[in-house]
């Protein structure tokens, strides 16, 4: 990403234009289709407002779930929420590329906002292919001629190579929206050689994903220290030869984590700057106690208080801190303290903090203040994972190829 030049909304003329804005408002819904977390919807309000304030007519496109899944729903409820947060009418169109949708787009006046229905109603949108193929898709061929500009504000889908993400930049002058721009500039700090030391705090249960991240960080010598928690810490503890007792080993085996031991051991033997807990908070017959990592008898549920202190001391001196995944079973109040400690140290330190994913946010206490000038909460789950794993992000590649005609 570091060598890609991504055009932003500052690089193109966006005054009184017809704008196609790709957002990601894919939200968790309950069994009745009611949205239970609208944070992704709120995230895009600033970009939409800016476009409307410049006299543009804006057509929004997004997906919701996948065909066959329970969360594959219409975007009608999403339109109501966007309207609520903008405090203005948002026209919902129960169509995507049909005659009705195209007619409504043509009729949309300046300062008007229209949301097309779930873009994954179009089967092409589920196909992963290069931009050169997707620019020829029905979706792009039907919609692109109706617009002056395409803006991609959907960082959470940046790892997808689908028509709505990579097709339009080859057909229209295109740029990153403000959410996308913030994500890209925040993540660029990870590769800035001057911002050291860089501390990566990696926990949670997605161990197969996390070991890919660690291998990339070590290969590119990006991380000065990697602090492990959650099941990631247990993997590296076992790889180092620690006996975590049969019960914990059984859990790791069931989750397929023991198969990763050779890769973890190889990283440790290479001298990678990986820190593992010196103590754990464990549960024994419903009781919570702390035990040294070398003498674990209970079921591991969190990092211990000594480990939390050690990790916090590393974090406070860092220039960049990346937090991905909790240190323990964060859903249980008894095992939140490890995550709270590293989060508190990050927020109180002098460095720039990137928080990936919502789990760590749930560890925030009311007295923990987030300074938006030095803290970035990423919206991109899969996209962030691929980026940290060293993969290219198709959305950014496509934007870098865009036919930008600034001022035309």
Curated annotation (Swiss-Prot):
SUPFAM superfamilies per UniProt: Phosphoglycerate kinase
Keyword annotations from UniProtKB, A to Z: ATP-binding, Cytoplasm, Glycolysis, Kinase, Nucleotide-binding, Transferase
Catalytic activity entry: (2R)-3-phosphoglycerate + ATP = (2R)-3-phospho-glyceroyl phosphate + ADP
Keyword Nucleotide-binding belongs to the record: yes
Biological process annotations from GO: gluconeogenesis; glycolytic process
PROSITE patterns referenced in this protein's UniProt entry, alphabetically: PGLYCERATE_KINASE
E.C. numbers: 2.7.2.3
Name under which the protein is recorded: Phosphoglycerate kinase
Top-level EC class: transferase
Taxonomic path: Archaea, Thermoproteota, Thermoprotei, Sulfolobales, Sulfolobaceae
GO cellular component, one term: cytosol
Organism: Saccharolobus solfataricus (strain ATCC 35092 / DSM 1617 / JCM 11322 / P2)
UniProt-annotated binding residues for substrate: 24-26, 40, 63-66, 120, 160
Gene name as annotated: pgk
Localization (cell): Cytoplasm
Gene3D superfamilies, per the entry: Phosphoglycerate kinase, N-terminal domain
Bridged cysteine pairs (disulfide): none
Superkingdom assignment: Archaea
Family membership noted in the UniProt record: Belongs to the phosphoglycerate kinase family.
């Amino acid at each position: 990403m570091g060598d890609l030049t991504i055009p932003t909304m500052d690089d193109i003329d966006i005054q009184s234009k017809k704008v196609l804005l790709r957002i990601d408002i894919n939200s968790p819904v309950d069994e009745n289709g009611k949205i239970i977390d609208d944070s992704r919807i709120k995230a895009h309000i600033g970009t939409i407002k800016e476009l409307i304030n410049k006299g543009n007519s804006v057509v929004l496109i997004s997906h919701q779930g996948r065909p066959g899944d329970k969360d594959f729903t219409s975007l009608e409820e999403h339109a109501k929420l966007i309207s609520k947060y903008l405090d203005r009418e948002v026209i919902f169109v129960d169509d995507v590329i049909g005659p009705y949708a195209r007619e409504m787009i043509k009729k949309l006046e300046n300062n008007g906002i229209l949301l097309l229905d779930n873009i994954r109603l179009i089967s092409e949108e589920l196909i992963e292919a290069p931009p050169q193929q997707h620019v020829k898709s029905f979706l792009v061929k039907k919609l692109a001629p109706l617009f002056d500009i395409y803006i991609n504000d959907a960082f959470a889908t940046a790892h997808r190579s689908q028509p709505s993400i990579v097709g339009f930049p080859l057909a229209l002058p295109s740029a990153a929206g403000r959410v996308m721009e913030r994500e890209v500039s925040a993540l660029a700090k990870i590769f800035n050689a001057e911002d050291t030391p860089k501390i990566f705090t990696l926990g949670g249960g997605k161990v197969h994903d996390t070991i890919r991240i660690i291998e990339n960080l070590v290969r590119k010598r990006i991380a000065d220290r990697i602090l492990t928690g959650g099941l990631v810490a247990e993997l590296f503890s076992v790889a180092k030869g620690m006996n975590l007792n049969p019960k914990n080993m059984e859990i790791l085996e069931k989750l397929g984590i023991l198969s990763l031991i050779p890769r973890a051991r190889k990283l440790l033997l290479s001298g990678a700057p990986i820190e593992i807990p010196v103590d754990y908070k464990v549960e024994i017959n419903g009781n919570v106690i702390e035990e040294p990592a070398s003498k674990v008898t209970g079921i591991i549920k969190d990092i211990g208080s000594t480990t939390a202190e050690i990790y916090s001391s590393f974090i406070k001196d860092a220039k960049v801190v990346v937090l991905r995944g909790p240190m323990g079973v964060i859903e249980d109040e008894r095992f939140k303290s490890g995550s709270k400690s590293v989060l508190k140290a990050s927020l109180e330190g002098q460095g720039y903090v990137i928080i990936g994913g919502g789990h760590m946010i749930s560890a925030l206490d009311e007295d923990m203040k987030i300074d938006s000038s030095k803290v970035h909460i990423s919206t991109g789950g899969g996209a962030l994972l691929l980026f940290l794993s060293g993969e290219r992000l198709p959305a950014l590649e496509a934007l870098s190829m865009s036919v930008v005609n600034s001022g035309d």
